[in-house]
UniProtKB/Swiss-Prot annotation:
It comes from the Bacteria. It is found in: Cytoplasm. S-adenosyl-L-methionine binds at residues 161, 182, 204, 248. One of its GO terms (cellular component) is cytoplasm. Belongs to the methyltransferase superfamily. PrmA family. Its EC number is 2.1.1.-. GO terms for molecular function: protein-lysine N-methyltransferase activity. InterPro entries: Ribosomal_L11_MeTrfase_PrmA, Ribosomal_PrmA_MeTrfase, SAM-dependent_MTases_sf. This is Ribosomal protein L11 methyltransferase. Keywords: Cytoplasm, Methyltransferase, S-adenosyl-L-methionine, Transferase. GO terms for biological process: methylation.
């Protein structure tokens, strides 16, 4: 088989939207080369598995590489893929010095290239995300989430995902019922299940994402707790007693359904919203307040924000 590599040079803020677009066009795997991963100070908890080399990373920004079977259909789609990525600026997503390059690669190169940049990542004192092909020995009481990022939508390493997982660690109680809106890879649902949630509904509008989530959920043996549904946000989800709703999606999308979140939550229920770039945080905060939600806490990592709000006790 012949493969093509699509290489996109962009900003850290654009990583997840760009990766999602590439996956929606049929990418079989996505790798992310972010210089911030190298420059960020980390305690080397993972030995050689976690070793990073400066030469593996760009001078600035982020390089995203996606791998496609080189078919006639893909070749014809190349201009559309590039234009769709450029159109992300209409959502106020900064692309930086955007560069879009397509190269041919052989089978062996494709099979290993994207795995080079994905390593175990400790999200909290208790939770570590581990690529499915790595051997990793957890410490006592450590929660391991196995992911195969070749399938779709997020590896758990992006700041917005980390913000959500930390908030779940703080607010989720054993036995809680939860809805994960825009589940992507399923990582937040899996984390919630392993933190003790009793029942989880994971929704995503994209069929590729729901299939990826189902596979990752099976990989983590949490399918008895998590139900995956292809669905548009909370549309036609007739629930009014949910303990937590979590959504790691763009601010513009969060603005579409705060009233539905309010209706889905039981009194005292928590809404964890992330995927919010810093300059959109105030707009989202006001929309949540206007829907009747009470702001509990605002957390920030880099340019990204998570807003935790709750429905008042009536």
């Amino acid at each position: 088989m012949e493969w093509s590599e699509v290489e996109v040079h962009t900003t850290n803020e654009a990583v997840e939207p760009v990766a999602n677009v590439l996956t929606e066009f049929g990418a079989a795997g996505v790798s992310i080369e972010d210089v911030a991963d190298f420059l960020r100070e980390r305690e080397d908890k993972f030995g050689e598995i976690y070793a990073l080399k400066r030469e593996d990373y760009p001078e600035d920004g982020v390089i995203i590489k996606a791998y496609f079977l080189k078919t006639t259909e893909f070749v014809e789609q190349i201009p559309e893929i590039e234009q769709t990525l450029k159109n992300l600026t209409t959502f106020d997503i900064p692309l930086g010095k955007f560069q879009f390059v397509v190269n041919d690669v052989d089978d062996e190169e494709w099979a290993t290239a994207w795995k080079k940049y994905y390593h175990p990542v400790q999200i909290t004192d208790r939770i570590t995300i581990v690529p499915s092909w790595e051997s990793y020995t957890p410490s006592a009481n450590e929660i391991i989430i196995e992911l195969d990022p070749g399938m779709a939508f997020g590896t758990g390493t992006h700041p917005t995902t980390q913000l959500c997982i930390r908030a779940l660690s703080d607010y989720l109680q054993p036995g809680d019922e939860l809805i994960d809106v825009g589940t992507g890879s399923g990582v937040l649902s899996i984390a919630s299940a392993k933190l003790g949630a009793k029942s989880i509904l994971a929704t995503d509008l994209d069929e590729i994402a729901t299939r990826a989530a189902e596979e990752n959920i099976r990989l983590n043996k949490t399918e008895n707790i998590i139900t995956v549904k292809q669905n548009n946000l909370l549309q036609d989800i007739n629930k009014s007693d949910v303990d937590i709703v979590v959504a790691n999606i763009l601010a513009e999308v969060i603005l579409l359904f705060p009233e539905d979140v309010y209706k889905a939550l039981k009194p005292g229920g928590i809404f964890i919203a992330s995927g919010i770039i810093e300059d959109k945080a105030k707009v989202v905060e006001e929309a949540l307040k206007n829907a009747g939600l009470i702001i509990e806490k605002i957390e920030q990592q880099g340019d990204w924000v998570a807003i935790i709000s709750k429905r008042g006790v009536e």
